[in-house]
């Protein structure tokens, strides 16, 4: 059991615990941001909030919203 704890701790040190999130970004009133009229809106908006990139993703039938990769 001691070895399991030591190995787990060593993995955390090697891998690191810093992580990023993916998800939809919202306007200040908590509304999802539509991709239309231009998908470039997503990339610019996501990068403004610290993401690595953004693109259109289908949320539900026929509705596309901005999806951000690597949000901090």
Swiss-Prot record:
Disulfide bonds join 35-56, 42-66, 46-68. Its main location: secreted. Residues 21-72 form the LCN-type CS-alpha/beta domain. It comes from the Eukaryota. The keyword Magnesium does not apply. Gene3D superfamilies: Knottin, scorpion toxin-like. GO terms for molecular function: sodium channel inhibitor activity; toxin activity. GO terms for cellular component: extracellular region. Residues 72 form a propeptide. Keywords: Disulfide bond, Ion channel impairing toxin, Neurotoxin, Secreted, Signal, Toxin. Residues 1-19 form the signal peptide. Expressed by the venom gland. One of its GO terms (biological process) is defense response. InterPro entries: LCN-type_CS_alpha_beta_dom, Scorpion_toxin-like, Scorpion_toxin-like_sf, Scorpion_toxinL/defensin. It is found in: Secreted. Has the structural arrangement of an alpha-helix connected to antiparallel beta-sheets by disulfide bonds (CS-alpha/beta). Belongs to the long (3 C-C) scorpion toxin superfamily. This is Probable neurotoxin pcD-996. It comes from Androctonus australis.
